[in-house]
Amino acid sequence: MSKLLETMKQTKDMIKNYRKYLKKIENSIKTILKDSQIFLFGSIITGNLVAGSDIDILIIANVPKKHLKRAELIAEIEENAGLPLSHPFEFHLLTQEELNTWIKIYKLRFEDISAYLES
């Protein structure tokens, strides 16, 4: 099987079994950004999750303004959670103030990650 097809199959399997990964992701986020709040939004909470979807993870924390620093935090979260280079999880780091703006502009609907963790 080609590397591309293997990656696509792995991503599809991760979407199908996303709950298995969420606890590792939550633990990683809480280790790196101790006072963070973690939510899910997008197709995962609207019930429209399909094989080609991503899983949007919203992290509210006291994060740096610079996008490069945020990208470094995301890379650290991914590595600490043991995620492969290609995965369906899309991380969004926001401050509380930025979240308030997002809610006004995008009418954002989100739910706490705990509702989606494997029991």
What are these regions (language model features)?
Residues 41-43:
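Glycine-rich beta-strand-to-loop/alpha-helix junction loops that act as flexible
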Residues 1-37, 46-52, 61-119:
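Catalytic core of pol beta-like nucleotidyltransferases
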